[in-house]
């Protein structure tokens, strides 16, 4: 809401957002990028936000993880006992007895592991959830305390929401259950080696030589992965900005048929994100391959060396195997840490930017409690020799030694042309910025010496673009004062003349206002903003074009309200309109950052050559109504009016806001008060009905083009899966060899060693292949889903975006987080599933060939393992669904607050926003904690069952050996084959959490992809007229906004507009004037009745073509964060479509060429987010040029000149007059000067056309609506 300051950009604006030339800018960006690549936070810093209970949870979780990790080495010891029991008692009657004792120990171990595993998972998941929540709110809190300059230069709303929804998930992943898993695996590793040294140190030492190699491979991999993932994040952040801009300005996009362009630029950015995800996949695979290669080779070494030890050092075969197995189990667990390491790396990269922001000390700190707090202030304001330039454009001086004194209780008005620096004065008094040198004093004390929060609480700001938050009217007003009572709020609405219209709304004070206050008309929003300022009871009142957005009737009443409020307060007014200014105690005329004149209205008029007199004369030219005085007032007023409106826009120029508002002022009103509610209750079904389940086949079908890639990947995964069970056979063969005579032992140990190396080489080839192929398939799928979903969303009818669950913040979160999750369902999940199936299958085959009876017995028990896995998946699923959308609501709170940071700052509402945010987060956090408990139980239980299965199988084996049905060797072959298979299977269950989240994500994405747009701009069918005359007819229209079905806008509206004529629509704020424009553009369709163009029903015409015939200039122009040239060319559909000469011709017509050429980079100036770097008047002229480039047959002007001061307004009006020739033009306006020359004036009242005719005829109707509107203007300006 860069309203004030940057708007003041007027002057400011002459500079692009950075002072470097574009080329240099790109280079520095590249340098920054390269630095950014490797930026990470040291791991322990991720836990900087843990409190004492978190520390306790982490300690318990770590103890559990260590216990759980140690269970494996202990199991191998028991296993050594088993080999001995079997070996020594093969032919013994005691075998069952001896073995069953060992088996019982297995059961005890299982029980211990159950407890440890529960602690590990539950504690880590819960603490991860808690800390992530704390990081989110700390981040939001620091974002809110930053100085306004930070938002001008370093960040934007899209980025903040992206970090809060996307990056915190990565951080939570890195500090939650993954840490527990990591500790578990590491303790298996360490514990294993300690036991191995006890059993046989020499052999262990030999095997240890491979560890450094393993570690190096792992480290290299982590490094590469981190790099690739931060590169991917950077690319995706750019794509997110495209989403935010497009959906936030959907009406502008639709009107200029810019959907194609948005889709193309989105695709460009997601393709670069795709490339880095492939790199990431390949490097992970390569790392794993190298690790396994080293691992199997070290095995080969151990077997050859172990054979040597048996011959030379008298080791027993059992001891050698024991050492080898322990070392294997230990090192294997090290290999399994890779997903954890990847997650840590991604979390550290994500945390870097967030923590940098959290650490940033703002230059102007709202939370700083130091500084003076006085009993009260008188309210003298002085600017002393102030030098200032906006942080976004440091080389452009706004003030160069500016001074101004306003005594307490006085009303000072600042006038001057657009861009002279008027609003900058207000930004400095609010201390949004500090001057470079010089001082701003209140009661003679430098503003910097006061406690910021306290001094802001003494200042009330009503700006030209009031920003409201997505909550109820009551909550919006309550921002003015902490703990305000309902009585105080009601009194404030009375004073601000808002009580009447609020009472009419179905829910009264509890009516929800939409994103950026879209559900209300401009005048209504302004009155709520005034009520909010009144509630504060400020000593100093700052009015930045406060009444400009109102029509004559409301403006008069609001002005009276303001006059009442201004009594005994120091008031600073920025205005174009003289009527507002004349009664001020002092008028200061500002020109290019200098005060050229000051005095009262009458004093300044005495100097007929003075700047003030010239401004007044300018306004009179625009008018020839009765007396010059009157006229001047009224036109000024209007102009002002306008300004404000325009202003409005920049605030949050979400286009949605924009449009609605524009769309009719009131529509405004009518439009939305419900919408949010609706979003939740009536239309709300959308948010409440569970989304239909998406079948996996449907998602898989999207991956169709990658079938060859997936097939190859599957083959690789299958080979990879078979490696471990094969490994099991080899071990049992080796055990056999170790008990053979010396010469055979020597020969066999060499042979098996070579086989092991071969196994390693296979792994080295297969692993990277598998990862790379699945990364390609998964990456392409994500890219395809993102572009499908975005493409579909962009073509939705405008009404769809009025629902809160489709706001720009929510859509951004859907596209970034959900699409990534879906990949887990197809690519990653498939690769893992195939690998596990292969492990299981090969394990079973090997087991059955060895001893079918034993294999069958074990097989019967396998479902136990399966059931437990299933239970775990089921539990994970239950909770992830709502948690995600709940966080979406919370991120909407953040989106609102960051988008309106000036309002939050001036009302010291940071605490309030934080409370709302925390309230929205409570539910999801509770769910996360519940999920932790249940997952912990499931996880622990799976271990217990596993150990019981082992105990039973060995007991059964002992029985079979006793009965002579199998040999001790085969028992081990069955055991190893199945253990290895089980390890594979248990790995797959670790992926359970992702699949449940992914299904929910898929449902939310497919809900968009499957929805039929009611008014689809991508639909190429429909008639296209050869040549358009421009006759428009509206017959018997009735209309209500879909979001507020209970408020009727049009009842039975009829209006005929002849080709080439100009029709002006007038009426009160909220009568539905702008709605006519929305309907002509087919943003909405009427509920009944017909609209025709040249006799053809609009619905029968091709939508895209229809919109290309119309040029819209709204009261709040939406510009994109791109160059001026690109913004103008947007009218043509793309920068390539418009030639340089067309662009310049359009700019000249719109009277914009002069100011564009005077900026350093001319047409290559970047206008900033929502056009912030330009002043209101400049934005408007660029918007007019954009409409002109289209060469439209029909021109729609919705308060188009309202935001301009007298000088620019005259010139733009001339431009418009030139453009309007021979075009059908529809003008919505408050200001008489604009309306008088129209061929037909239509007065809209109560949903119908009450009067129509020319100015001359209508003015003569005694007591007519038009005549009384004109009369109002006159008196108001008097």
Swiss-Prot record:
ATP 1 binds at residues 416-423. Residues 1-13, 21-35 have a biased composition (Basic and acidic residues). ATP 2 binds at residues 1067-1074. Present in roots and flower buds. Residues 629-654 have a biased composition (Polar residues). GO terms for molecular function: ABC-type transporter activity; ATP binding; ATP hydrolysis activity. This is ABC transporter B family member 11. It comes from Arabidopsis thaliana. InterPro entries: AAA+_ATPase, ABC1_TM_dom, ABC1_TM_sf, ABC_transporter-like_ATP-bd, ABC_transporter-like_CS, P-loop_NTPase, Type_1_exporter. Residues 381-617, 1032-1271 form the ABC transporter domain. GO terms for cellular component: extracellular region; plasma membrane; plasmodesma. Disruption phenotype: Slight defects in primary root elongation. Increased incidence of root waving and skewing in response to mechanical perturbation and directional light. Reduced pistils length in the abcb1 abcb11 abcb19 triple mutant compared to the double mutant abcb1 abcb19. Keywords: ATP-binding, Glycoprotein, Membrane, Nucleotide-binding, Repeat, Transmembrane, Transmembrane helix, Transport. It is found in: Membrane. Involved in the regulation of auxin transport required for pistil elongation. The chain crosses the membrane at residues 55-75, 106-126, 182-202, 205-225, 285-305, 314-334, 711-731, 751-771, 824-844, 845-865, 932-952, 971-991. Residues 58-346, 710-997 form the ABC transmembrane type-1 domain. Glycans are attached at residues 483, 568, 653, 806, 1121, 1222. It catalyses: (indol-3-yl)acetate(in) + ATP + H2O = (indol-3-yl)acetate(out) + ADP + phosphate + H(+). It is a multi-pass membrane protein. Belongs to the ABC transporter superfamily. ABCB family. Multidrug resistance exporter (TC 3.A.1.201) subfamily.
